[in-house]
Every structure is written in structure tokens, then in C-alpha cells.
Regions:
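Exposed beta-sheet edge and beta->alpha loop/turn motif
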Residues: 92-170
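Short solvent-exposed beta->alpha transition segments
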Residues: 30-31, 46-103
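Intrinsic-disorder-associated interaction segments
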Residues: 22, 26, 59, 63-66, ...
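Short, low-complexity N-terminal intrinsically disordered segments enriched in polar/charged residues
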Residues: 4, 15-42
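Generic surface-pattern signal
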Residues: 38-42, 71, 75-79, 154, ...
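Hydrophobic alpha-helical core bundles mediating ligand binding, dimerization, or RNAP-core interactions
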Residues: 33, 40, 52, 142-143
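Sec-dependent signal peptide recognition
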Residues: 1-7
Length: 170
């Protein structure tokens, strides 16, 4: 009986530690997404590139080409007078594993102002923690599909349903 009590206490401790870790992971990926989005709208190209997954960087032609693409996007955002008015996380991140990686699907709800108009955007960022890595990197969610996620990240859980996304004028 004593060993059963000890086992239950140990299991409760492990479950509690996992819940704390999960909460810390959720806070971390949300803060990383906040940093990434702020960096984009503030023109911080280095931070945007640092938070972009290496597979995406490679598909863009390498770091120099990726930097140029981000710089061009920043110019378009500034020319359109686009600003993030608000950024919230409507649901907690979902964590998945596959192909030796950890993934975080981080839902976002933002209000963007542009040339006197406001746009509401429900979207998500796909976070990736590669084996041996300590920092999460991301892929913008509206560009991720069940088909291309397997090309980008073989082993991603094939049955996962990505959250919906939309953009609408307010």
C-alpha cells in the first residue's frame, strides 16, 4: 500500500511538473510570436529573419535573399501606413510532435490599421523546435496546408486540422 501511495504522489508530481512546463512553453511561444510580429511592423529585419524557420530561409534563396524579401515587405508595410493596433491570443497554443520536432500552433487575433482603415486578422503561427534547438522558429500560418507542411516538415502529424484564418475589414 505504501508503494502505491508513493507511486501516486510521484505521478501527481510529474503531471504537475508537465503542466508547469506546458504553461511555460505556451507563454514562451506567445511572447516569441509577439516579438516576431512587432519586429516585422517595426522594420527589425534581423529579428524577423532570426525567428523564421531555416527551411523557409533556404526556400527563399538563403539568408541574404530572405533579408531582402523582409526589407521589401517592411517598405510595403510602411508605404501602406500599416500598424498593429492590437495583438491577442484567442486560444492557447497547441503542442504537437512529429519527425523528431516539436510544433506549436499559436492562434493570433490582430487588428491592423492601414491608410485609415482597420483589418481584423484571425491567423496562426506555426512554431517549430528542431531537435537539439533551444529557440523556436516560425512559419506564418495562412501559408501552411496539410500538403505543404509534410514537404516543409516531414513527420508533422498528418491528421492535424489547422485552425481557420480570415481577414476582414472592420
Amino acid at each position: 500500500m505504501t508503494w502505491l501511495c508513493s507511486l501516486l504522489v510521484a505521478l501527481a508530481f510529474v503531471a504537475s511538473a508537465e503542466a508547469v512546463q506546458s504553461g511555460q512553453d505556451a507563454s514562451r511561444v506567445q511572447e516569441d510570436v509577439r516579438t516576431l510580429i512587432r519586429a516585422l511592423y517595426n522594420g527589425d529585419v534581423d529579428t524577423v529573419v532570426r525567428y523564421t524557420h531555416p527551411t523557409v530561409i533556404a526556400m527563399q534563396g538563403g539568408t541574404s535573399a530572405a533579408r531582402k524579401l523582409v526589407q521589401d515587405l517592411v517598405v510595403k508595410l510602411k508605404d501602406g501606413d500599416m500598424r498593429v493596433e492590437s495583438l491577442t491570443f484567442p486560444k492557447p497554443p497547441e503542442f504537437l510532435e512529429g519527425g523528431g520536432r516539436r510544433f506549436a500552433v499559436v492562434p493570433t487575433l490582430s487588428i491592423i490599421s492601414a491608410n485609415g482603415q482597420q483589418i481584423e486578422s484571425l491567423n496562426f503561427q506555426l512554431g517549430i523546435l528542431d531537435p537539439g534547438a533551444t529557440d523556436w522558429t516560425f512559419v506564418e500560418g495562412s501559408r501552411v496546408t496539410k500538403q505543404n507542411v509534410q514537404v516543409l516538415f516531414p513527420g508533422f502529424p498528418a491528421t492535424y486540422e489547422f485552425p481557420p484564418f480570415y481577414r476582414k475589414r472592420l
